[in-house]
Amino acid sequence: MAKQRHSKSRQIQPTPVASGNGVAPKSMSRRQFLGNSAAGLGGALLATTPLGAYAQDLEPFIPAPNSLSNGRSGGINTGKPEKDFIEEMRDYVIAISRWAKSYRSDFAVIAMNGLELTEFLEKTLFDTRGVAEPARNYLRALDAILVEAPFYGFENYGEPTNAEETKYILGYLERLKLEGLQYLAVDYTENRADMNKARAQLKGLDALYYAAPPPGMQLSSLAKVPSTPFGSNPHVIDNIRQANNFAMVLDSSPYGTKDAYVEALAATNYDTLIIDPFHRGTIPLTYDDMKRLRYKKTGTPRVLISYLNIATAETYRYYWKSGWRAGSPDYVSEGNLMARWGQEHHVHYWTREWQSIIFGNESSYLGNIMKLGFDGVLMAGIDEYAWWLDY
């Protein structure tokens, strides 16, 4: 039986590294993003959203669950909208997946954390504690799940994750093995012995493993240990299931220029690269950049996955407008004090207005990511439901 709880965020101190100089960078306009991302890219643009594509319009495959995960007040927080925040997030992710895969069926949809969304807790007549059942529709929408710090770095870089947390994470992954999902694990350590221990514990789960280097949990450089990727190979990698390894670099500011950043990543043999589609959060990658990143150092293709925060508004992104603040527009809430890089606001992620920024038409964030040629998306912010439950 699964123990249900709300996601616990690691205590990351906000540091505005996205700007590289400690101040909020200048916003990139939607037109600039479109122009840069589509440069040199032929073919038809993604169509506008068909009716019923947003999460609010989804017709569920199964009845809504009687879920204990709705929290102590049925998902209602004082002063907050009356919402089942967990089910709203599930519907949102499902809608994103359906829309993306309607244009490219092999587009990989990866959830970052948020393991609690994978199961319902159903009360029964004889067991009021709840019986765990897989959230089938949500799981069908995913190709993979990435978990952070299952063994090292949950609280502080290089320190072992507490045993209870590790057991909790591995318990979910063990139960979900039969669902056919690919697992990716990111630890925060540079100790090779620790990496070997972690990989041994993941062996039965066939998970891809990456140990991010310091500083902290900023994911701002490539790992130096080991010197070559685990399972390095010269093979053609067409999808994430063929990959033996991956690297994850989300803050490129330490590299200086975009060319230096792209060159550093291109000169690796990782089967999969998970990266931000913007250099330093503001300068979009181009089609030419993507062509350079597409091939491993060996010359064979690899998989490129884009990072996308689907549930917090990042103030340095192209979509952020100068007049926005908490409460204006209505779907923007207060600042996220625990953001990985600061400069973020919680949002009403269940609203059509916010979702239309993220996906559903050719000028949406995900629309541009797909036009640029990424093979999939890593969705961050999935565990935002916990903030709304615990507010």
What residue spans do the PLM features occupy?
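Sec-dependent signal peptide hydrophobic core
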Residues: 37-45
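Glycan-processing catalytic domains of CAZymes
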Residues: 58-391
